[in-house]
């Protein structure tokens, strides 16, 4: 019974970032994305939910790997801060349409992600490396966000 509870907890840990991302996306209207001017090399709208789903799952897996033996409070706090910043970006960009503020928010997310990766690396190198696609995607998002600022 104890192992069953642990397995359920581990599954929740892995999928929690994905669920959070889905819930935060329900708060906004993505139709705005279709009407704003976007920079060159902007991915098609359909790419975003696919990419974010993969990245959120990798985030959950990293968190699980780093905490599977014991909970590391630094990793936990870094993860929570990062996800709060991440989820709030969606609201700031799409709902509030505050593109400059959302770009600043992205810089904070990138810095938070670097801190998260450093904390993960101390505990589990694989967990840290799983976050590099997330970091790269955040840099792409910053490029897109700045492009939206310039073009709109």
Q: Predicted segment positions?
A:
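Membrane-interface helix-boundary motifs at transmembrane edges
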Residues: 2-6, 65-75, 120-129
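Alpha-helical transmembrane segments
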Residues: 9-21, 81-84
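Alpha-helical transmembrane segments of multi-pass membrane proteins
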Residues: 17-32
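Membrane-interface helix termini and inter-helical loops of multi-pass transporters
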Residues: 29-42, 151
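Membrane-interface loop-to-helix entry segments
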Residues: 45-57, 97-108
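Core segments of transmembrane alpha-helices
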Residues: 52-63, 82-85, 109
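Membrane-interface helix caps and helix-loop-helix hairpins in membrane proteins
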Residues: 91-101, 148-152
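Terminal transmembrane helical module of multi-pass membrane proteins
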Residues: 126-152
């Amino acid at each position: 019974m104890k192992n069953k509870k642990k397995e359920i907890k581990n599954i929740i840990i892995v999928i929690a970032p994905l669920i959070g991302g889905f819930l935060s996306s329900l708060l906004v209207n993505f139709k705005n994305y279709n009407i704003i001017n976007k920079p060159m090399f902007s991915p098609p709208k359909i790419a975003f939910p696919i990419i974010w789903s993969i990245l959120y799952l990798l985030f959950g897996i990293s968190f699980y790997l780093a905490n599977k033996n014991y909970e590391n409070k630094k990793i936990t706090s870094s993860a929570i801060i990062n996800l709060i910043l991440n989820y709030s970006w969606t609201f700031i960009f799409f709902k509030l349409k505050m593109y400059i503020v959302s770009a600043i928010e992205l810089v904070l997310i990138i810095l938070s992600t670097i801190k998260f990766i450093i904390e993960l690396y101390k505990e589990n190198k694989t967990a840290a490396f799983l976050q590099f696609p997330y970091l790269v995607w955040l840099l792409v998002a910053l490029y897109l966000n700045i492009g939206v600022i310039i073009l709109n």
